[in-house]
Amino acid sequence: MKKIKVCLVDDNRELIGLLEDYISEQEDMEVIGVAYNGQECLSILKDKNPDVLVLDIIMPHLDGLAVLGQLKEMKKENYPNVIMLTAFGQEDVTKKAVDLGAAYFILKPFDMENLVNHIRQVSGQTSSFMQRSSSSMRSHRDSKPANLDASITSIIHEIGVPAHIKGYLYLREAISMVYKDIELLGSITKVLYPDIAKKYNTTASRVERAIR
């Protein structure tokens, strides 16, 4: 069986280590390179041809968008399928990344099983592996919301958002909603903020100001 070749790029070394271990455990995948900034990523891509590039947007030296721009200029014969990782969704950034060739967006924090399934999808592999694990996925489905809430709380604390401000509640809700429906990243001001505003009986503009 031909394995999906994956390259991982993120300045969070701990996350890269976890992803590398998890992906390497998949029967149909192999990690052929890891990088911690945009320059290292481009160096790897000069010599290697991953099927899927998992790329963080915010990184030192060169960010994810700059990497996409330079990757396009390289005119590689085998252009990788790019999955972007992002902590915050902004419509202008999302649109620019798509224009530069990004195939999919995943909002941090994310479920690793969800990521590997998307790696299979963008690489065009069959869904047999997804079907094989469907029963185990169903058995864990009830526990996911609690794990998701814990992950969201952890990441918000890490970026230093105080729990007592309103933006904290709105941000938690936004992350949870986008986790369940990634397409909301393309309609942040038109759908996401208004939906949060309805839930908290406020206006979309106030939600946006509080989050920013």
From Swiss-Prot:
Cofactor: Ca(2+)
Family matches, as CDD domains: REC_Spo0A
Record PTM text: Phosphorylated by KinA and KinB.
Keyword Nucleotidyltransferase attached: no
SUPFAM superfamilies: C-terminal effector domain of the bipartite response regulators (SSF46894), CheY-like (SSF52172)
Residues that coordinate or bind Ca(2+): 10-11, 56
Modified residues (4-aspartylphosphate): 56
Subcellular localization: Cytoplasm
GO molecular function, one term: calcium ion binding
Record note on cofactor: Binds 1 Ca(2+) ion per subunit.
GO biological process: detection of stimulus; phosphorelay signal transduction system; regulation of sporulation resulting in formation of a cellular spore; sporulation resulting in formation of a cellular spore
Assigned GO CC terms: cytoplasm
DNA-binding annotation, residue ranges on this chain: 194-212
Domain Response regulatory: 5-123
One Pfam family this sequence matches: Spo0A_C
Functional note: May play the central regulatory role in sporulation. It may be an element of the effector pathway responsible for the activation of sporulation genes in response to nutritional stress. Spo0A may act in concert with Spo0H (a sigma factor) to control the expression of some genes that are critical to the sporulation process. Repressor of abrB, activator of the spoIIa operon. Binds the DNA sequence 5'-TGNCGAA-3' (0A box).
This protein's name: Stage 0 sporulation protein A
Native species: Priestia megaterium (Bacillus megaterium)
Name of the gene encoding the protein in the UniProt record: spo0A
